[in-house]
Amino acid sequence: MRRWSSIPLGLALALVASAAIAHPLDYRVDTVHSQVLFSADHDGYSKPVGRLAIARGWLRFDPDDWGASKVVVDIDLASADLGDKGWNAAVTGSKFLDAAKFPTAHFESVAVTKTGKDTGTLDGKLTLHGVALPVKVDFTVNRVGATLFGFETIAGFSGRAKLDRTQFGMNAFPKAIGTEVTIRLEIEASLDRHAEYDYQQAANKLMRSRAHAAAQH
């Protein structure tokens, strides 16, 4: 009798567990294992690749309902690295990123559409160089699951996008430097139910710090 009476309880627990798994889960972007790569034509000779670091970010992902997903990322523009101090200074300087005036780029998704088994399109708004414009990112879900030793649950994504730098007010050297910039994203994020809250706290703290610094001048 005891054996049979345990079946409804077990079934109920299984249903509860299934419902919990179906909900969107929040992840904190791993800034060490995530990168933003950018490339533009250099006078027709080559397309050098540079790297930008992600300062902070979080994402929400539901493998059963991609439409409920969301991504918010801040990119550290002063971190731009093309492997040469001169190039780095030029790219982060006033003629291009102007990182001293605009230290971060901000991307926030507004819609996520599944296009294939592991592929999708991310529509969002990118704020760069003081200009906010819509940007579309094509992405692939590489893997979602526990790490080798099971200490963390990680979600991994790769993405690509293209933008016209002149639309963001970066008009210098249009003949020597291509206006179309190709963006490649490699993202790893750790399961963290506090990811959104922690991001907001860090962003608010940074905003207050910048406001205080501006008031001192």
Over which residues does each language-model region extend?
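Low-complexity, acidic/polar, glycine-enriched regions of mature
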Residues: 21-217
